[in-house]
């Protein structure tokens, strides 16, 4: 549940990282009696101890012990590690780092920002124009956890013949990616 909530937070509100990565901050508190400055430090020591750390939340009570929902980013891959009921703060950081390193060690990312390297056209039957220009709406990302050689990814562009009317936003084909004979 903690991992799911953390994923929702960092996905829907990525600006949380602007706050969760702050190590120390001086705050000025102003009242009618004047102002005073005091320092706040992040209780998530992972921020200082792990170069890929991006947050997120620590917690501890006598019942729950020491807990952490840790987020990190390395080579375009985001990870979440949740540790609970640790005996102390140092152990929670050590175990979170071990989990994150394990995850990053298992994951490789294949990314194709421009799925189409050239402009493609689909034939159009009964149209005012014989061809419709095609473009991709977004790039392609694949996270591999099997240790496959991602340089072996094959890409195939398939364009289907269209019948008029063809309007902007209509799908005229697809880009298919294969790795080890799997799509």
Q: Which positions does each model-derived feature cover?
A:
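Active-site loop and adjoining helix of the penicillin-binding protein/serine DD-peptidase-beta-lactamase fold
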Residues: 1
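Domain-terminus/edge residues, biased toward the C-terminal soluble/receptor-binding domains
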Residues: 4-183
């Amino acid at each position: 549940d903690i991992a799911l909530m953390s994923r929702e937070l960092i996905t829907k509100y990525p600006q949380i990282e602007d706050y969760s990565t702050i190590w120390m901050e001086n705050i000025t508190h102003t009242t009618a009696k004047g102002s005073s400055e005091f320092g706040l430090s992040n209780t998530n020591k992972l921020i200082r101890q792990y170069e890929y750390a991006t947050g997120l939340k620590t917690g501890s009570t006598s019942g729950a012990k020491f807990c952490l929902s840790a987020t990190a980013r390395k080579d375009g891959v985001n990870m979440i590690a949740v540790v609970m009921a640790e005996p102390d703060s140092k152990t929670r950081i050590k175990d979170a780092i071990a989990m994150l390193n394990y995850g990053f060690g298992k994951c490789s990312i294949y990314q194709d920002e421009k799925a189409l390297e050239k402009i493609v056209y689909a034939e159009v039957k009964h149209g005012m124009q014989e061809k419709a220009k095609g473009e991709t709406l977004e790039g392609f990302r694949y996270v591999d956890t099997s240790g496959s050689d991602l340089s072996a990814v094959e890409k195939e562009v398939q364009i289907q013949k269209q019948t008029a009317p063809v309007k902007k936003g209509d799908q005229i084909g697809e880009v298919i990616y294969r790795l080890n004979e799997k799509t």
